Curated annotation (Swiss-Prot):
Residues 145-167, 208-218 have a biased composition (Polar residues). Belongs to the RodZ family. The lineage of its organism: Bacteria, Pseudomonadati, Pseudomonadota, Gammaproteobacteria, Enterobacterales. GO terms for biological process: regulation of cell shape. The helix-turn-helix (HTH) motif in the cytoplasmic domain of the N-terminus is involved in the formation of spirals to maintain the rigid rod shape. As this protein is anchored in the cytoplasmic membrane, the HTH motif may contribute to protein-protein interactions to form the RodZ helix, which is localized beneath the cytoplasmic membrane. The C-terminal domain may be critical for determination of the rod shape by probably interacting with enzymes required for synthesis of the peptidoglycan layer, including PBPs in the periplasm. Residues 1-111 are cytoplasmic. It comes from Escherichia coli O17:K52:H18 (strain UMN026 / ExPEC). One of its GO terms (cellular component) is plasma membrane. Its main location: membrane. It is found in: Cell inner membrane. This is Cytoskeleton protein RodZ.
Amino acid sequence: MNTEATHDQNEALTTGARLRNAREQLGLSQQAVAERLCLKVSTVRDIEEDKAPADLASTFLRGYIRSYARLVHIPEEELLPGLEKQAPLRAAKVAPMQSFSLGKRRKKRDGWLMTFTWLVLFVVIGLSGAWWWQDHKAQQEEITTMADQSSAELSSNSEQGQSVPLNTSTTTDPATTSTPPASVDTTATNTQTPAVTAPAPAVDPQQNAVVSPSQANVDTAATPAPTATITPDGAAPLPTDQAGVTTPAADPNALVMNFTADCWLEVTDATGKKLFSGMQRKDGNLNLTGQAPYKLKIGAPAAVQIQYQGKPVDLSRFIRTNQVARLTLNAEQSPAQ
């Protein structure tokens, strides 16, 4: 009867009360139990007061109670009914697991995106290279065309130069035909000399007998005339005094070019006249004058040094890009492309 009474009494007590009674019977304090179980004193107090901390999972709470029961020598089977009430098991909320296929699909999508990015990059690089090649090829073709034009102009100029002697030979005929009157004049002057030399001393009679008037004319015609310079009719003699000769003033719009390598060049003034168009060889130079502004087209800007109005012209922007230089030199020496 006493055993059944104690059993009923134990069932009437809660889990926390039974653990507290057992602890007091063993003479242990809450601090000692907390140190042995490696728990906080507040946790031991909550267990004895049958409280379930909100921040503590039921699984951990049931484990702490079992450890406390073993410490105070209480069978765990006797505490199971109370554990179900004090620390009921809660259904854990399981987060939905992500399917592996979703990650695989995302990875596949990332792969397609990366492939598309590389494809766009290759297309941009290819288009840039094609554009550069077309520009370079167009410049080379333009230089070749300009060189062909200059060679054609040079050949036409050479043909015209070969036909010039024919014209000069015909123009020299009047000069040759006009010389006899000059000789006639000299003979006329010579025929007048006897009258001038009449007061001279007498000559040997034998010499006068030998020389006839016709022979005298022949001798005087054979002797060179004292006046050797013949000028055309109506032309004034050129001055020989060097002090009177004045040098022309330097043109302020003069264009001076020095060449360090072979270069094709075309220079046009404001009137549209081509001052020069053709190839210039290495170590050559040009000094051109015309009406400003000048329009220049240079095949190799790095091969020429230009001075306009005594100042150098900057061609660095054309040299860096390695392209045909097209610029205009205004009167105030401001080159513009």
